[in-house]
């Protein structure tokens, strides 16, 4: 399929193990995003892997220790791929739809097995894999959301014994870049959950959740309705005068079709049973979530929680004061900073999700006083090296698909390449970045 094809690709491979296993590791590199499975279980607790890079110059691989998950006899490894930054489908103003790397998401993987007798075996990405686009993920995009059809879930697709005879074969292609490096940084996780502080029914089939805090992340929820009911979950930061969600402050750069591919909205088709959903290939900036259903659904205040998603950097500093306003301002500042840390520092978690260099270096001192973020900034400095032209020119946003070179922002922005390494040295004594 070409890059305009929307359903997410699923892949699976069977392999047999006949000897006791001493160790097993998976190394997986993906152009796009992924969710990795082994013998019916999703691996890891991270999100939005691998982190965003300039795909035609550097790709990241992630490592998993799966020794305890390997079984004797038949095993199955499976993966679902999301578009992420690799394959932008709706239009925005930064020309990502014209990125030189743009293509359908793809992956390569090695599963290294070491047996107790010292022998070794590698299960790799070859023609032995099977694939389909007939699963529940019908559409996904980093700016808009996910379309998920519960009636199309393939029960047991990632387990031994599943009949994949109707699945197709795979096609091999080159990696986007010859440089594939280990992702050595604090991963992105859903680090905190917020229950709704307010819940309101707006009409017969519309509901509003208020989580009390502005954040980057996703919602996790369960609901029940008739099979085929379409539920839209819209996310935003403010309400209009009518008490309904208002996205007009955050969708200003979006150029896609707001009816067929709405901004910051997950669109679900229900199975008829109790369905549970959490977006995996997308994140939003929001405080409120508005649920709109095509038919009645069973839903209440406890049906939905907000998941605060960001690079999982440990907090190393804090401010304590008898003045609660100061403490509140610091808490809000830290919440805003973490909402803009997704493997690189961003300007906002909704409108753009771009790594504006000026924003990044202006926040570096506040960042390092409060959080152990060196691995994120080491990665971002590598992104700077990927983007720097032979004459030294840098773009305004990093990573970029080519947008942002030759603007009038100048040193106020691109001095990030000096200011951030200098601050990493001041805080850590580290001369490497």
Residues covered by each model-derived region:
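Functionally critical mobile loop/hinge segments
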Residues: 351, 355, 367, 381
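Glycine-rich, acidic and aromatic/proline-enriched surface loops and short helix-turn segments
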Residues: 32, 335, 339, 369-390, ...
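Well-ordered alpha-helical scaffold segments within catalytic/enzyme domains
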Residues: 362-373, 417-433
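Aromatic-lined, polymer-binding surfaces characteristic
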Residues: 353-360, 386-398, 405-421, 425
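Extracellular/oxidizing-compartment recognition motifs
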Residues: 1-351, 358-359, 375-378, 395-405, ...
């Amino acid at each position: 399929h070409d890059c305009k094809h929307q359903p997410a690709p699923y892949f699976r491979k069977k392999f047999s193990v006949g000897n006791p296993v001493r160790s097993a590791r998976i190394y997986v590199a993906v152009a796009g995003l992924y969710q990795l499975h082994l013998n019916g279980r999703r691996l890891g607790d991270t999100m939005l892997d691998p982190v965003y890079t300039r795909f035609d110059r550097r790709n990241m691989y992630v490592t998993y220790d799966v020794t305890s998950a390997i079984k004797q006899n038949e095993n199955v490894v499976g993966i679902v791929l999301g578009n992420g930054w690799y394959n932008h489908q709706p239009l925005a103003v930064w020309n990502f739809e014209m990125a030189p790397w743009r293509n359908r998401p793809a992956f390569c993987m090695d599963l290294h097995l070491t047996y107790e007798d010292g022998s070794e075996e590698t299960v790799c990405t070859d023609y032995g894999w099977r694939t389909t686009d007939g699963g529940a993920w019908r559409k996904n995009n980093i700016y808009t959301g996910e379309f998920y059809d519960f009636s199309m879930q393939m029960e047991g697709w990632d387990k031994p014994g599943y009949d994949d005879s109707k699945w197709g074969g795979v096609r091999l292609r080159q990696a986007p870049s010859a440089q594939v490096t280990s992702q050595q940084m604090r991963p992105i996780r859903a680090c905190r959950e917020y229950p709704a502080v307010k819940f309101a029914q707006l009409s017969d089939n519309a509901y509003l959740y208020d989580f009390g805090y502005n954040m980057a992340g996703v919602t996790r929820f369960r609901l029940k309705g008739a099979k085929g009911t379409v539920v839209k979950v819209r996310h935003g930061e403010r309400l209009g005068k009518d008490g309904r969600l208002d996205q007009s402050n955050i969708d200003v750069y979006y150029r896609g079709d707001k009816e067929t591919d709405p901004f910051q909205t997950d669109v679900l088709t229900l199975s008829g049973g109790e369905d549970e959903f959490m977006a995996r290939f997308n994140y939003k900036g929001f405080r409120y979530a508005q649920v709109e259903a095509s038919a009645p659904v069973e839903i209440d205040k406890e049906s939905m929680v907000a998941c605060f998603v960001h690079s999982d950097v440990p907090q190393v500093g804090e401010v304590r004061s008898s003045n609660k306003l100061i403490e509140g301002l610091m808490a809000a500042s830290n919440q805003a900073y973490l909402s803009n840390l997704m493997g690189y520092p961003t300007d906002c978690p909704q409108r753009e999700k771009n790594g504006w260099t000026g924003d990044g270096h202006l926040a570096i001192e506040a960042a390092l006083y409060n959080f152990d973020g060196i691995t994120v900034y080491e990665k971002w400095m590598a992104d700077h090296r990927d983007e720097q032209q032979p004459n030294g020119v840098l773009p305004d946003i990093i990573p970029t698909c080519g947008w942002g070179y030759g603007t009038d922002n100048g040193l106020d922005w691109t001095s990030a390449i000096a200011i951030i390494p200098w601050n990493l040295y001041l805080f850590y004594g580290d001369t490497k970045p």
